[in-house]
């Protein structure tokens, strides 16, 4: 390399190699710097109301299952229906299934999931929409179909704008809602803390085992989901919650505010 390629002079007896090295950009260590990766994390100041709700949930999660007052966690998620443009090539010994990246959008539907984590029972339902009416009828199923013998259900939910008593009143009227609410205790996660709802864990498992693939119709989704739900219930698949109040105070106390 010419000694003046960098636009600077070189003192007699010095090495142009040293100058070149000093102007080279250090190589990025592929194990240390991955600028294309990002992590989403939402942790706000934890108010007394946040802590009150969190402590209540963590206390309930420690208790044994009570069939008269079952603890049930509920959540919902949208599912995009997709149809393959071309038939996939089925898997064979030594060869994975192959499918084309192109697909047709066939609309969306909604999946309700409720789980009694200590009992190992879950209940799912597919609806066309995620409106107040859909929520109300899923709650009706929980009370009258799935837990008819319970004195009341302790129902854990997030703060979605349909997850309130008003949805029941709008759908069934005040008298029927009063009857239902005598058998319900709504328990809400803190805002921005849906991770405290064990139904999210069940939905993640559902996506990995059942609904994470392309499904082209509501009917096929309902059949597939019903079979998965039955298998999980037959095996009494429970969720063991390990995060305690002590863990919360240790990990989150720096965010606590008075």
What are these regions (language model features)?
Residues 1-20, 64:
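A short, amphipathic alpha-helix used for macromolecular contacts
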Residues 6, 10, 54-133, 137-140, ...:
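Extended, low-complexity cationic-aromatic segments
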Residues 20-33:
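Major-groove recognition helix of helix-turn-helix-like DNA-binding domains
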Residues 45, 85, 220-258:
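C-terminal domain-tail junction helix/linker
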Residues 98-103, 176-198, 214-215:
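RNase H-like polynucleotidyl transferase catalytic core
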Residues 134-154:
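Short, basic/hydrophobic alpha-helical segments
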Residues 150-164:
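Acidic/histidine-rich, metal-coordinating catalytic segments
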Residues 191, 199-218, 231-233:
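Active-site proximal helix-loop segment of RNase H-like, two-metal nucleases, encompassing DDE(D)
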């Amino acid at each position: 390399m010419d000694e003046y390629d960098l636009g600077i002079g070189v003192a007699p007896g010095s090495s142009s190699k040293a100058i070149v090295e000093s102007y080279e950009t250090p190589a990025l260590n592929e194990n240390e710097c991955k600028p294309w990766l990002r992590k989403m994390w939402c942790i706000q100041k934890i108010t007394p109301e946040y802590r009150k709700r969190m402590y209540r949930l963590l206390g309930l999660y420690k208790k044994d299952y009570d069939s008269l007052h079952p603890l049930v966690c509920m959540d919902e998620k949208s599912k995009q229906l997709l149809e393959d443009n071309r038939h996939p090539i089925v898997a064979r010994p030594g060869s994975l299934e192959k499918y084309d990246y192109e697909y047709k959008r066939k609309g969306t539907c909604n999946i309700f999931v409720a789980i009694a984590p200590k009992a190992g029972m879950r209940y799912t339902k597919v609806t066309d929409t995620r409106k107040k009416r859909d929520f109300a009828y899923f709650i009706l199923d929980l009370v009258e179909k799935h837990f008819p013998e319970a004195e009341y259900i302790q129902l854990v939910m997030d703060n979605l704008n349909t997850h309130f008593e008003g949805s029941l009143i709008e759908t069934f009227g005040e008298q029927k809602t009063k009857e239902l609410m005598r058998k319900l205790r709504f328990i809400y996660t803190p805002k921005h803390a849906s991770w405290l709802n064990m139904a999210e864990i069940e939905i993640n498992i559902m996506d990995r085992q059942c609904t994470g693939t392309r499904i082209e119709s509501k009917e096929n989704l309902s059949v597939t989901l019903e079979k998965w739900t039955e298998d999980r219930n037959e095996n009494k698949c429970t969720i063991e919650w390990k995060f305690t109040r002590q863990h919360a105070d240790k990990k989150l106390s720096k965010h606590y505010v008075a």
